[in-house]
Amino acid sequence: MGKYLLTLAVIFTAGHSSINLSAQTVLETVQVEAYRLSSPEALITGALHIVDSASIHSFAASDLSTALNGIPGVKMETRGDGGSRRLHVRGSALRSPYSVRNTMLYYDGFVLTEADGNSPLEWIDPDLVQSLSLVSGPAAASFGGAYGGALNIYTPSFTKSATHAWVHSQAGTTGNNDLGINTRISSGVDIGFENMGVSISAIMTDNPGYRTWEWNNKTQLNLRFKYFDKAGGIHSMLAGHFDGDWALPGAIKQSQVDTLPTASPGADYNAHVARLRDIAGYKFEKTFNSGWEFSTSLLGRFTSKTNPYGTSQFYKGYKEESGSGYSLLASAGKRIYEGNVWSLDFEMTVMHLDDKIHITELESEPSELPTGIIIPMRYDLTMNAQQNFVSTSWVATRLNNFRIEGQIGLSNRSRTISGWTPGYGGLRNRSSSPLYSDNVSTLHSIKKTHSTILPRIGLSWEVAPGYSLFAQASTGFSDPTAFELVNPEDGQISELDSESAFGMEMGIRAQLYDQVKIGFTAYQSSVNSAILQVVQENDAIAFANIDGGLIMSGLELEIDYIISDQINIRAYGSQTLHHFGEETDHAGNSLPGSPRTSGGVQLNSNYSWGTARLNTRHIGETPLNNEGSSVMDAYSVIDASVSINLPYDMSLELGARNILDAEYSAWPQLNGVYGKFYNPAPPRTAYLSIRWGI
């Protein structure tokens, strides 16, 4: 195996590439900030990972998983290419069984994360993204919450007085010849004027999946507008529509994986998600003559979802969800002192999130039945959630080689849950209860409020040119989401408390030679009142606050080696020690979903004729349940591709994923009942992608 990998590495050595801008004047440049603060790379006070367009668009990516999985300590999982998605950052896996929690999501300065902490990662399509940055670990003083960090998405810049259109078409195998091929067609046009730019794009995807019930499809429309006024203000607007459906295949046992990996128990219940999202937003930015930099954004959102199977025993049920809300973000900053030795910068941010979510769950899916047949309702609940956040930052820099940052934030969150759930021991009141008439119902109105002081301190020191040390300590929190509202065992409201977290990290960045750069980080985080999955008496998966805490510690390493002007190698890896606290029922056991080791090698090479890439990734043994009695075997995956430059600004990419035909589960079902832990990933697949710029 080692010789085979080495041979592949030599053949497919690959390099860095990025989207080429024309030679015309660019109206703007994307600036990546660390902890809301502009900083030279050498003086960033914590772990910040930046991913360029080449990594985001490579290997026929349908989402950000390829890009994010190349970051140490990060694991993005999907059920089928383009299906359900979840994101784990430094051990935050247990709060993300079906979605993205514990990680704040920003899109060109707009807050996409909702007030309950859920982040709609399905909105982010690679064809919309120029670059991204990820801050790992607790950083609530900077971003308002989420002990898993913050993900910042940046879209392409506009080009002055130029029009650029593009088309991207893609087709690939799924690993199951009986189901057909997956397809993508996306196109857009960017129009740049003297003082404004407009971008319109549309994306359509369809994937029949590898397993018999693993299909997904989506249609997405996007609009961006930017205007530069004569007074120096920058006005940005965005709007978009997302219409996506994805099947929920359901986890299976190891015996089924060995004999029929395409088996999908969810097919028997029509288990799937149908999601609609609409967003619209406005942002204003300006730098004043006094030196103040000001930015504010307002984003409105609407969503609806239908979900046959609900959260009940044996996967039966039908759930409907609708929600609306908005996010407001404003910040101002200025260098308030600059001397010969020291400089002092000040920044302040205010954020408000407000969302209303209505969820109804029925005993079974509505159907074309005769009038008069009533389908029993399990619950009918509305959650109103708000977050208010204010934070100030003070940054002192000495001689451009030493920096200390202090941030203090205050967060106030409230959520009110009202509506009906099944009741027990009370009097039936059919006239006042909208629930089914043959059971008792209970009216609820529950309010929870949390106020948290959020400090952060960080420092960095460039001890010699190219060699920097950094350290920081910071806090975080995570509130219960709408998904965790109801206990599936008895249908009652789960009165969960907010999680709190504290994290520390320290590390080094070193430019060993002109060609070699390394980064090393050691971290430790603790989480109190952790919200974890527990298995109920009816085998349903529920959530509960666990006393005793969680401990997440680990080591992360990155190495970049530029072999020549064409060839670049990047290696990364992490070693984790994530476990339950000593006062928990599972003291000392490893946290499910956190591989003990992970890493990979990326080889890239640019030539006049095109680009070649090789991506290897290894995931070590992964615990699957709280008791530590079940472990998923380690696995390695290798992807390879070749891109060829064609006339008329066209490019053709040919590639294969999982070329060694590794057998593994891309989505382990943590704490799965009856041994149902596995969602098998596709075997070897191939794809063809064509991009055309006009």
Q: Where would I find each of the regions flagged by the language model?
A:
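N-terminal periplasmic accessory domains that precede
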Residues: 64-65, 86-90, 103-107, 119-122, ...
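Extracytoplasmic beta-strand/coil segments of soluble accessory domains associated
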Residues: 65-110
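Short acidic/polar hinge/loop motifs at secondary-structure boundaries
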Residues: 110-138
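Gram-negative outer-membrane beta-barrel transporters
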Residues: 168, 338, 397-401, 412, ...
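Surface-exposed extracellular loop regions of Gram-negative outer-membrane beta-barrel proteins
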Residues: 245-247, 251-259, 352-373, 414-438, ...
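Membrane-embedded beta-barrel scaffold of Gram-negative outer-membrane proteins
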Residues: 283-287, 293-307, 462, 468-476, ...
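Flexible loop and strand-edge segments within Gram-negative outer membrane beta-barrel domains
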Residues: 211-214, 228, 232-281, 300-323, ...
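Transmembrane beta-barrel wall of Gram-negative outer-membrane proteins
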Residues: 178-249, 271-293, 332, 336-340, ...
